[in-house]
Amino acid sequence: MTVPEIISDGKSTRRNLQKLLFFGATSATLAIAALTSRSIATRKYIPTFFQLNTKIPTFSSKSEAQAALGLSSGLSLGIFAITTTGFCWALDISSASDFKQRMKTLFNTIDEKEYMNDSDPETNKIIEELEALINKK
């Protein structure tokens, strides 16, 4: 197996994992959104033909508040998860340290050489092999 094959294989595996995390967060958020919509629809009071529409049915405000808090928290966390996983997938960020390094380079607080030296030993070995191949030509 050559160096480019190793790099492309590892990258495709990582990007597939990021894609699955993104789609998992999206499907969970859509499920919570459907649950929220169904919950709102069941709470809607529609009187029958001979019932008064001015008489409000009894309900527990405590359970209503708990349900609203739980559903809104679920939607907020879901949107946050979609945003985070989508951002990491689009920018090919695989870990928190990778994110930190990318933000430092974005704001010009880290040198490019320092960014490259902070990677793992396996990556350094692959980089050295690539540089040797390039310099050989």
Curated annotation (Swiss-Prot):
InterPro entries: AIM11
Superkingdom of the organism of origin: Eukaryota
Keyword Disulfide bond: no
Keywords on record: Membrane, Transmembrane, Transmembrane helix
Annotated GO CC locations: membrane; mitochondrion
Membrane topology: Multi-pass membrane protein
Main subcellular localisation: membrane
Location of the protein in the cell: Membrane
Segments passing through the bilayer: 20-42, 69-91
Family in the record: Belongs to the AIM11 family.
Name under which the protein is recorded: Altered inheritance of mitochondria protein 11
Gene designation per UniProt: AIM11
